[in-house]
Amino acid sequence: MLGQRDILLHLVGLMEEYKIPYLLTGSFAVSYYGFPRATHDIDFVVEIHLAEKSNILKLLQRLGPGFDYDEKLVVKAIESFRQFAVFHFDTGIKVDFWIRKPGEFERNKFKRSRIIKIGNKHIAAVSAEDLILTKLVWCKQIRSERHLRDCVGIIKTQQKQLDRKYLKLWAKKLRVVEFLAEVKESDYSGY
């Protein structure tokens, strides 16, 4: 039976084969940079344009039995820079593919990506700073204690490695300065 890590590695291999630029994000990235947390999903940001939709559709067809997705929703997600999901019913794992939106911050995520190692595979992941900023932007829309807790864990774990100048600059540009101050001053146990 496939596990979450097996599915992650399988997908990364296929994205590399089909030359689809990707970043691992979400709970896997949070667990790598901060405090681990259990989840039944895998999140990727993918850079794909409508003209290249056949690549992602071919990749999805190669996933194998047990995986389910809606091809129309995939195309719609690419057209509207949204997200689509793939489900693996045997394990209950959901894989979210977030289409990279236009804009400087979103482009920066790919320029500033980090290579992390999971198993024997090198995987492109969102940087710790961009993961924090993304979660704070989501909190600006709908406050989430889980996202704030994730940010606290990343900041506490990555203290010396964080590019604080970049965080401060982009917190201002993204209008999340108050959230950044809140998580920098927070005690993890207080959430």
Residue ranges and their predicted role:
Residues M1-Y191:
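Compositionally biased terminal segments of proteins
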